[in-house]
């Protein structure tokens, strides 16, 4: 499945919530009516079946983190094989992706931009260049912008945006040095309450 490159507002309207796919403190323009489905006339949503609700939740989380279908399925299998709650394990695996950590630290304005920074070899982990967005960051790892990329305007702008919206507690960042530490894997209570991972578990359990 190819990666979606169309309008970001359309995806948020499809899921009925702001997925924060666009840069800025408020990701969507006021004209983007997330209460209505995509399309010129934006039909109101009818009642969904249990399966439809579960599928929409999976698609929402997949789109938030910018993960393709096959990758997401792989993460679920890995989460199910680990000890603990499968849903929480799944969210933690997604949070530990390098592109997501780069976004959480504020080096990229969006996860898509952060993924591009990683792919273009602008990011290092513990002093070593890593260009794999799905690389799993571990507690204590130092994630930094490489010297050759530190003067990029978009990184400075992303750090400003992050300062406005607030940084998560499980990363510690030196904005001047453009370097940060992934202090710990976030607990479920630290993550968005707008995600109902139990619906995803129900979907894959069928």
UniProtKB/Swiss-Prot annotation:
Entry's family note: Belongs to the universal ribosomal protein uS4 family.
Location of the S4 RNA-binding domain: 96-156
Domain of life per record: Bacteria
Organism expressing this protein natively: Ectopseudomonas mendocina (strain ymp)
Stated name of the protein: Small ribosomal subunit protein uS4
Function per UniProt: One of the primary rRNA binding proteins, it binds directly to 16S rRNA where it nucleates assembly of the body of the 30S subunit. With S5 and S12 plays an important role in translational accuracy.
Assembly information from the UniProt record: Part of the 30S ribosomal subunit. Contacts protein S5. The interaction surface between S4 and S5 is involved in control of translational fidelity.
One cellular-component annotation, GO: small ribosomal subunit
GO biological processes: ribosomal small subunit biogenesis; translation
Keywords: Ribonucleoprotein, Ribosomal protein, RNA-binding, rRNA-binding
Protein's gene: rpsD
Gene Ontology terms for molecular function: rRNA binding; structural constituent of ribosome
């Amino acid at each position: 499945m190819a990666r979606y490159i169309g309008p970001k507002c359309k995806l948020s309207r499809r899921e009925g919530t702001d997925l924060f796919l666009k840069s800025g403190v408020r990701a969507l323009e006021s004209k983007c009516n997330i209460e209505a489905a995509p399309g010129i006339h934006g039909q109101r949503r009818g009642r969904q079946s249990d399966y439809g609700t579960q599928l929409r939740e999976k698609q929402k989380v997949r789109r938030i983190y910018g993960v393709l279908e096959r990758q997401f399925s792989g993460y679920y299998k890995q989460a199910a094989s680990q000890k603990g709650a499968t849903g929480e394990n799944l969210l933690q695996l997604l949070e530990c992706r390098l592109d997501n950590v780069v976004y959480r630290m504020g080096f990229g304005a969006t996860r898509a931009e952060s993924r591009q920074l990683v792919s273009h070899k602008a990011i290092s982990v513990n002093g070593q260049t890593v260009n794999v967005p799905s690389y799993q960051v571990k507690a204590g790892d130092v994630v930094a912008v490489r010297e050759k990329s530190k003067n990029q305007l978009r990184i400075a702008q992303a750090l400003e945006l992050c300062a406005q919206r607030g940084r998560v507690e499980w990363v510690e960042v030196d904005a001047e040095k453009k370097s940060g530490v992934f202090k710990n894997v976030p607990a479920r209570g630290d993550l968005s309450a707008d995600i109902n991972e139990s619906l995803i578990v129900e979907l894959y359990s069928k």
